[in-house]
Amino acid sequence: MQCLERFGLHFDLGLQRGQVPVATELVRQCPNVRFMLNHIGVPDIKNNALDPWRQEIRALAAYPNAFCKMSGAATLADHQSWKPEDLQPALEHVIDCFGFERTAFGSDWPVMLSATAYPRWVEAAVWAVRGCSKAEKRRLFHDTAVDFYGLPPVLNT
């Protein structure tokens, strides 16, 4: 894993519920490799059981080489009846822990189609950050991913 640094590569962490502590140890052991946690670390949104996930996310976010993709939240909720309000506690927590500088919006497409349509997920994510500044929203929905993955910008400044 540490050889990724030599090639300027990063690593996306696709975990199962309960594996955030293992990822945290990997991130700790590879301080010069950037890691993107997918699906906000797979909290139990459906049952509104966010502990110990909250503490695990805070511990992971303490490492500056750890980033978090705000994806998969709808698929972690009740597929039939989720509302944006159901997702907000988990989404707010990752933004609180990682900040906008290290949190990137992700679609989780096509998997998210099992829980919702793409426009509904985008609306829920936008709703979750409705009180944030334009600069913070731009960071979340564009800049963090551009910077992390080395993509060409698609938004004008």
Predicted segments — roles?
Residues 108:
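Active-site glycine-centered loops adjacent to acidic/histidine catalytic or metal-binding residues
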Residues 92-93, 97-104, 113-157:
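Mid-to-C-terminal alpha-helical segments outside catalytic/metal-binding sites
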